[in-house]
């Protein structure tokens, strides 16, 4: 009796295994995003709402930020420079053909600590490292997963970003939009289909856990549909220019704070960042945290701010974000950058057109798109990220602003060397 399997059956079996494993990766990514955001929500509720309501400690914000920063500094001195951002993780995958997965619990704790003390960073850093690490663990321990480990890691990172930002196509373009060759490879074959399977599983698990146990972060609020007037189109150049100025400021301060941080010994640099964060948060609480919830508040109360005050907040938010990232209170930059772009857009639109809702929404969209385009150099990813925040009719204008930003800002911050904690 001939037990030899036909090539067709073997190919079908391999394809099914690929689809099932990608669905599993997506489900794990969705669950991890939910766990991180839930712990973050419970922790911040306790530290910043429940505990202050039960005590009357003077300078509470400064105390929590400094004490938390000291803990983070000691943690990083013991375990290393975590969390790593998406670009660092994927660069290691490209250069080393693998990613170390032995420190996944450390990555999770390192990602959570800055978020709990109100650091001006987003939650995406750390998540991608954990997901990619799990994929390489599977490649080392599961025979059928070994040959596709890099693809699995890219899909896992993309799904985690998409679920986190509630933007289905953002993750895949953020991971893949590095060159025209990458985009061409993405549109050929079955990679988009496989990503769709993983995304469906991740979104389903995240939605299910949120329905059963409550969600953590709710994602950026969506702006209402507005009428775009001729004046708005004429002001596009001004809004794009403002976004470019912010992008240049972000990149310049990223490099500057990185150079300054290297002069501080371990733990001291984190404490310094915590002190700056606490002082800034005491005077202007909107500067703390990622900016996701703060933007919802801003959408309702922006008319109570002077336009120049909103513009100032945009610059201070970017400066504080870079200070936190480079001085050890690390996290992602997407949420704070979007918040800064919206503040600048609101401020400029109010200066030129008054506080009318339609004008300020359009201004916020164009400034934010130009700003993100200048930082990320990925106009498609920027468009997909902002697609669910702003009205659909702005889609093409957002893409144009992001494309202009990605081409005109050339100051690229160099990768700052990680602090060597073992010698300090």
Identify what each model region corresponds to.
Residues 1-424:
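Alpha-helical transmembrane segments and immediately membrane-proximal extracytoplasmic
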């Amino acid at each position: 009796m001939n037990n030899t399997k036909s090539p067709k059956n073997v190919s079908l079996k391999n394809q099914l295994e690929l689809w099932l494993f990608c669905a599993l990766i997506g489900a794990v990514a969705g669950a991890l995003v939910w766990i991180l955001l839930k712990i973050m929500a419970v922790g911040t509720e306790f530290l910043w709402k429940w505990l202050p309501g039960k005590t009357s400690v003077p300078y509470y914000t400064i105390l929590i930020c400094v004490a938390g920063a000291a803990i983070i500094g000691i943690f990083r001195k013991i375990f290393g420079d975590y969390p790593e951002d998406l670009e660092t993780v994927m660069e290691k995958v490209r250069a080393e053909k693998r990613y170390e997965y032995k420190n996944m619990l450390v990555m999770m704790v390192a990602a959570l600590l800055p978020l709990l003390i109100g650091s001006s960073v987003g939650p995406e850093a750390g998540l991608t490292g954990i997901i990619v690490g799990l994929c390489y663990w599977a490649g080392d321990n599961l025979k059928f997963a070994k040959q596709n480990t890099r693809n699995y890691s890219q899909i896992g990172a993309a799904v985690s970003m998409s679920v986190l930002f509630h933007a289905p196509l953002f993750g895949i373009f953020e991971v893949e939009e590095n060159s025209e060759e990458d985009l061409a490879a993405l549109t050929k074959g079955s990679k988009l289909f496989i990503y769709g399977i993983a995304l469906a599983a991740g979104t389903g698990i995240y939605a299910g856990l949120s329905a059963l146990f409550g969600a953590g972060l709710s994602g950026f609020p969506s702006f209402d549909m507005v009428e775009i007037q001729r004046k708005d189109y004429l002001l596009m150049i001004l809004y794009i220019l403002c976004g470019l100025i912010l992008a240049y400021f972000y990149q310049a301060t990223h490099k500057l704070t990185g150079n300054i941080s290297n002069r501080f010994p371990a733990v001291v640099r984190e404490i310094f960042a915590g002190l700056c964060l606490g002082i800034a948060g005491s005077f202007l609480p909107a500067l703390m945290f990622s900016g996701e919830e703060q933007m919802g508040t801003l959408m309702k109360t922006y008319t109570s701010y002077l336009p120049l005050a909103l513009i100032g907040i945009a610059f201070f938010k970017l400066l504080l974000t870079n200070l936190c990232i480079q001085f050890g209170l690390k996290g992602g930059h997407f949420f704070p950058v979007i918040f800064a772009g919206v503040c600048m857009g609101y401020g400029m639109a109010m200066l030129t057109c008054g506080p009318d809702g339609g004008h300020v929404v359009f201004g916020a969209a164009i400034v934010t798109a130009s700003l993100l385009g200048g930082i990320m150099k990925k106009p498609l990813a920027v468009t997909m990220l902002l697609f669910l925040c702003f009205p659909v009719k702005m889609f093409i204008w957002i893409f144009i602003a992001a494309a202009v930003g990605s081409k005109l800002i050339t100051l690229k911050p160099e990768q700052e060397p990680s602090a060597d904690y073992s010698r300090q």
